[in-house]
Swiss-Prot record:
This is p-hydroxybenzoic acid efflux pump subunit AaeB. Forms an efflux pump with AaeA. Could function as a metabolic relief valve, allowing to eliminate certain compounds when they accumulate to high levels in the cell. Substrates are p-hydroxybenzoic acid (pHBA), 6-hydroxy-2-naphthoic and 2-hydroxycinnamate. GO terms for molecular function: transmembrane transporter activity. Pfam families: FUSC (PF04632). One of its GO terms (cellular component) is plasma membrane. The gene is aaeB.
Length: 655
């Protein structure tokens, strides 16, 4: 496909984006808004931003959800801006500096919350800054400006949603159904690989792919939940399927690890059974029926616990899968599965990374303020706004530097494009609303196609072009003002990029170490006799951390294997029949406290000391288990855990 070619699948969204822009423009001028540009810009960003993130036409509900987040972020930002202005109106410089800190604070929060919700916090940060900067000449008009900005943004969002509904958005339901079938086949094939006990790298690749696919399925569930309330039953089932899929991965990998020391546990009966190849979900269904008969014939005691647990989880997965596809009423058997254990939320491992993002945003905004005050440039305020926008939105993404480059390319492309609209097109179409709408629709259509291709600079060009062309009421054409705005955008993006380069993010290794220690803490916390604690479902949170580790350290197999081993240890110890008595319960609490100290330690020396203490406590704990005559189901996994921690103690403690 050529660089300027138009694929059929891109046309519908391009028309949708053009419609959203035209609707926002028409409504803005019809209701005599002072700056219809904000409504048009909001409609374009909400629609195009979702498509850029999806790499194509977004699924149904995605634009609506992003618009909802934008409304929340705008209202939080407006309220914060009003509070800052009321409190510090007599000290303008201090007021702007506090706004810079507020933008950094919002970026810090957005780095810690779920990535889907981070958009609202990033927006709240720079909205307050926009209000404070814009009202500098006339501070008494602050409430009016805040209300107008909120109104224009809500109009833009409503227009984007209307355009999305008008062109029948894609439903993700069929994709979910297909992925459920395919994922079950992949789970069976992983178990086959693990029972064969072949090449470790092949097994690593297989389970790594399944972790990514299960995480992607969880993302699809979020999209389906946003799409319509009629998928509420499917959403409940998919939430349980996520845990079941992770359980299948864990049991398969434990089957592989067990054979490293005790290959005789997997009998020839099961080896021969899993030799049969499967291609479709129907093949898996037949094999599972046969496997349940084999287990009933051999007996539960003669069946390896990992295979028995795997079959139970696969059977539940199959039952819920049928319910998701048909979206029928939840029956009693399904309800029993869905009334599972409560999921545990873990503390973010990216706190240091979040603090780096805070300083990047705060320092870049302060640098913009100093540049504005030093030069006295009329568009210094525009440069400040772009600095806040770039740093607030870029920091949460995996590669902030590339986001800043995208904005630089976009603002550079917006200069000639905006010049064409400012000097030629808009002056010749302002007498006709129809011609003005057509001219902006053409802009939205072609940039909408490029946005779906994730063309570098396309998203920045769309937003920057709309921002600098005259879409005010009434329209005024001052070339110096246009040029100042265009150059202000470019300078702001360059300054933001400079700060991102200068303030290095060296938090990757620290985040990796914290993640690994959180896996250790989870495995230690599984050693408990507390019934409520044993019922807690840590699996989704643990695999979410594993997925983050895989993204932070692509290709680092030793780290992935260590993390997976800790997850397996957690699951095995969680189900182990630990003797119930006060002596062991008190020691469990002591080990949990020590594991927490390992995570929270700020220096390598403290971390090594607490980790050494944890290893000593594990030795004492094993002795206590022997005294209390704990069965092998308890002593063996504890011994394996202690051995793993001894082996990898340097990786878990040293910076």
């Amino acid at each position: 496909m050529g660089i300027f070619s138009i694929a059929n699948q891109h046309i519908r969204f391009a028309v949708k984006l053009a419609t959203a822009i035209v609707l926002a423009l028409f409504v803005g001028f019809h209701f005599q808004l002072e700056t219809p540009r904000w409504a048009v810009l909001t409609a374009a960003i909400v629609a195009a931003g979702t498509a850029f993130a999806a790499g194509g036409e977004p699924y149904s509900g995605a634009i609506r959800y992003r618009g909802f987040l934008r409304i929340i972020g705008t209202f939080i930002g407006c309220i914060a801006g009003l509070v800052i202005i009321i409190a510090m109106i007599r000290a303008p410089l201090l007021m702007i500096l506090v706004c810079c800190i507020w933008a950094g604070f919002c970026t810090w929060i957005s780095s810690l919350v779920r990535i889907e919700n981070s958009y609202a916090w990033g927006l709240a940060g720079y909205t307050a800054l926009i209000i404070v900067i814009t009202i500098q000449p006339e501070p008494l008009l602050t409430p009016q400006f805040a209300v107008e900005r909120c109104s224009e943004i809500v109009i833009g969002i409503v227009c984007a949603i209307m355009a999305d509904l008008l062109f029948s958005p894609r439903s993700i339901k069929q994709e979910v159904d297909r992925e459920l079938e395919s994922l079950l086949v992949a789970q069976y094939q992983l178990m086959q690989l693990c029972i064969k006990h072949g090449d470790g790298e092949v097994v690593d690749k297989a389970w790594g792919d399944l972790v990514r696919r299960t995480t992607a399925l969880q993302g699809m569930r979020s999209n389906l939940n946003m799409e319509s309330s009629r998928w509420a039953r499917a959403n409940r089932r998919l939430k349980a399927i996520n845990t079941l899929s992770l359980t299948l991965i864990t049991q398969s990998c434990e089957t592989y690890l067990i054979q490293n020391t005790r290959p005789e546990l997997i009998t020839d009966t099961f080896r021969e059974f899993f030799d049969t190849p499967v291609e479709t979900a129907q093949d898996v269904h037949k094999q599972l029926k046969r496997l349940r008969r084999v287990i009933a014939w051999t007996g539960e005691r003669e069946t390896p616990v990992t295979i028995y647990s795997w079959v139970a989880a696969a059977t539940r997965y199959q039952l819920l899968k049928r319910g998701v596809i048909s979206n029928t009423k939840i029956n009693a058997t399904e309800e029993e599965i869905l009334q599972g254990e409560p999921e545990v939320k873990v503390e973010s491992a990216e706190r240091h990374h979040a603090m780096v993002n805070f300083w990047r945003t705060t320092l870049s905004c302060i640098l913009g303020t100093l540049f504005w005050l030093w030069t006295g440039w009329t568009s210094g305020s525009g440069a400040m706004v772009m600095i806040a926008v770039v740093t607030s939105l870029a920091m949460r993404l995996p590669n902030p530097r590339m986001v800043a480059i995208d904005f630089i390319y976009g603002t550079l492309a917006a200069l000639p494009l905006g010049l064409l609209y400012f000097l030629v097109i808009i002056p010749n179409t302002q007498q006709s609303m129809l011609l003005l709408c057509i001219s902006l629709a053409v802009l939205g259509f072609f940039l909408g196609i490029e946005v779906q291709k994730r063309r570098l600079g396309s998203m920045g060009a769309l937003a920057s072009t709309i921002n600098i062309i005259v879409l005010d009421n009434p329209m005024t054409f001052h070339f110096s003002q246009f040029l100042d705005s265009a150059l202000g955008q470019i300078v702001g993006c360059v300054l933001a990029f400079t700060v991102i380069l200068l303030v290095r993010d060296k938090s990757r290794d620290r985040t990796g170490r914290v993640l690994l220690n959180q896996f250790v803490s989870a495995a230690v916390s599984a050693m408990t006799t507390n019934v409520a604690r044993r019922k807690e479902n840590h699996l989704p949170a643990l695999y979410q951390q594993l997925f983050l580790l895989m993204n932070k350290f692509p290709g680092d197999l030793p780290k992935f294997r260590l993390a997976l081993t800790m997850i397996i240890a957690h699951q095995r110890l969680r189900d182990a029949p630990i003797p119930v008595n006060e002596d062991l319960s008190a020691f469990h609490r002591q080990m949990r406290r020590t594991a927490d100290h390992v995570i929270s330690a700020r220096s390598d020396d403290k971390r090594r000391r607490y980790f050494g203490q944890l290893l000593e406590e594990l030795e004492i704990y094993q002795e206590k288990l022997r005294i209390w005559q704990a069965p092998p189901q308890v002593t063996e996994p504890v011994n394996r855990l202690a051995g793993m921690l001894h082996k990898y103690q340097h990786a878990l403690t040293d910076s």
